[in-house]
Curated annotation (Swiss-Prot):
<keyword id="KW-0175">Coiled coil</keyword>
<feature type="domain" description="SH3">
    <location>
        <begin position="65"/>
        <end position="126"/>
    </location>
</feature>
<dbReference type="InterPro" id="IPR050384">
    <property type="entry name" value="Endophilin_SH3RF"/>
</dbReference>
<feature type="coiled-coil region">
    <location>
        <begin position="572"/>
        <end position="626"/>
    </location>
</feature>
<feature type="region of interest" description="Disordered">
    <location>
        <begin position="401"/>
        <end position="551"/>
    </location>
</feature>
<feature type="compositionally biased region" description="Polar residues">
    <location>
        <begin position="210"/>
        <end position="220"/>
    </location>
</feature>
<dbReference type="Pfam" id="PF07653">
    <property type="entry name" value="SH3_2"/>
</dbReference>
<feature type="region of interest" description="Disordered">
    <location>
        <begin position="133"/>
        <end position="361"/>
    </location>
</feature>
<feature type="compositionally biased region" description="Basic and acidic residues">
    <location>
        <begin position="401"/>
        <end position="416"/>
    </location>
</feature>
<feature type="compositionally biased region" description="Basic and acidic residues">
    <location>
        <begin position="177"/>
        <end position="186"/>
    </location>
</feature>
<dbReference type="GO" id="GO:0007015">
    <property type="term" value="P:actin filament organization"/>
</dbReference>
<protein>
    <recommendedName>
        <fullName>SH3 domain-containing protein 21</fullName>
    </recommendedName>
</protein>
<dbReference type="InterPro" id="IPR035468">
    <property type="entry name" value="SH3D21_SH3"/>
</dbReference>
<keyword id="KW-0728">SH3 domain</keyword>
<feature type="region of interest" description="Disordered">
    <location>
        <begin position="1"/>
        <end position="60"/>
    </location>
</feature>
<feature type="compositionally biased region" description="Basic and acidic residues">
    <location>
        <begin position="459"/>
        <end position="469"/>
    </location>
</feature>
<feature type="compositionally biased region" description="Basic and acidic residues">
    <location>
        <begin position="494"/>
        <end position="532"/>
    </location>
</feature>
Amino acid sequence: MVQSELQLQPRAGGRAEAASWGDRGNDKGGLGNPDMPSVSPGPQRPPKLSSLAYDSPPDYLQTVSHPEVYRVLFDYQPEAPDELALRRGDVVKVLSKTTEDKGWWEGECQGRRGVFPDNFVLPPPPIKKLVPRKVVSRESAPIKEPKKLMPKTSLPTVKKLATATTGPSKAKTSRTPSRDSQKLTSRDSGPNGGFQSGGSYHPGRKRSKTQTPQQRSVSSQEEEHSSPVKAPSVKRTPMPDKTATPERPPAPENAPSSKKIPAPDKVPSPEKTLTLGDKASIPGNSTSGKIPAPDKVPTPEKMVTPEDKASIPENSIIPEETLTVDKPSTPERVFSVEESPALEAPPMDKVPNPKMAPLGDEAPTLEKVLTPELSEEEVSTRDDIQFHHFSSEEALQKVKYFVAKEDPSSQEEAHTPEAPPPQPPSSERCLGEMKCTLVRGDSSPRQAELKSGPASRPALEKPHPHEEATTLPEEAPSNDERTPEEEAPPNEQRPLREEVLPKEGVASKEEVTLKEELPPKEEVAPKEEVPPIERAFAQKTRPIKPPPDSQETLALPSLVPQNYTENKNEGVDVTSLRGEVESLRRALELMEVQLERKLTDIWEELKSEKEQRRRLEVQVMQGTQKSQTPRVIHTQTQTY
């Protein structure tokens, strides 16, 4: 009340005038009253009315050519009849700043006119017009960096924002001075009235904010659409490296990475594997006509189909992450297709070779990779051979083959744990899981084949080496991949490698014994149950060296079993060999159980992370929608 009295005194001209005019309005009844014959109010009324009705329009017309819109910062309760009630967030149209009282403006808010204190509203800074656009460009810029899908969408939206924000400003400046025309324009503008009735800048800001979340929501929806294709890796890979994420959003466009790693890649790789497998099978057929070509061809086909299945999820797992990798890995033609997702360093390519093309590819591709290493490794392998000493020269040769080929693989596998840590683990997890399923699916029929043909064992030894080589390279790489999957440092990964290596080392001894056992399958039937890994180590070795002189190397193993049958008949202790094989089998089963546990744990972690990310995305989407809806409702209430 004190404020109102203080304000009334300086505003005696305005407020007292209004009050006296109201009093005179009360006197209207007194005009017809015979007790009050005073005529003085009559002649005085026109000037008052004229001062109110005719004096203010000129001011209004003077200022309305550039109408200003202010936003109310604080609530204001009117204390006089001519004051305007303000609510926080309302938009006030300033009709005149030249009132009789300093610090008071005349304006219109929600269809009511009146005066209000100027410090209750926020003046529109002219510079702020550009801020929303800059904010939009800044918000879209970081989106462009991590996501290359955004440049197409963000640029047009920025242009739309520019046009949208400039549109209202043009409409604002082109308004006619008359009040009715303003009302008409505001009504005609409909939902766009928010621009004309309430700050052209703030709606622009709202649009910018609403459009950028929409962009994000579109991209997130696309990512969710692609997430079933990408499998869990989508959830994990954004965190490890953001160089990968920029290339991910194209994945929805590429779908199962059809553009980046074209479908021909998936097709030619089988073709290459088949052709190379045929090459490998040709020497096999030349050395021994026992091996029918169909035996080898189906195995490549078998390998092709599961690996294609594996390759499709792999390629879709990290389609764009491998773009950088594909270029270095393409030299290794075959496995760059199916293994490229798991590769982020060329050393990793050396491991996938057995995985990818264990049949015939393993021979040429591995040799390309390993030939520089074979000389050193053969030196070390010969040391190992001397360490393992076997009486017969054939045994030594065979051990050389085994060790020379186990050690390259083992050393490569030992190298690989160092290379993969930069690789996002999720891709390798998926690879490991895919290959585990393949190993389980492939090894059982192959063991059945092994058990089914004991009599024709010498003849089948060569196809089965390749078949088992497929199972082993798949299983061995799965070990390699699981170690990086757990994101263990190389020190932790190497112990696993060392667990495999001792078993490989034992396999070198016992694979020789196996070779002794395998030829006379009639005598030693239980040996056919030897786990695929052991044989695969033995047979992984064959495809590696054959290319230089494939006929000789393949012929040697075929001759060695016959000599071994003679040696065995001369007195090899079969029971000790069985015991060793059993111990090896148990160790391998333990490893398999452990790896399965780890895989299940990793799979559960990935599932939980996937769910968490989906929840977060849903929350973000809901939050953006909630934040958008009140603004939209608010602008609509202001326009009407």
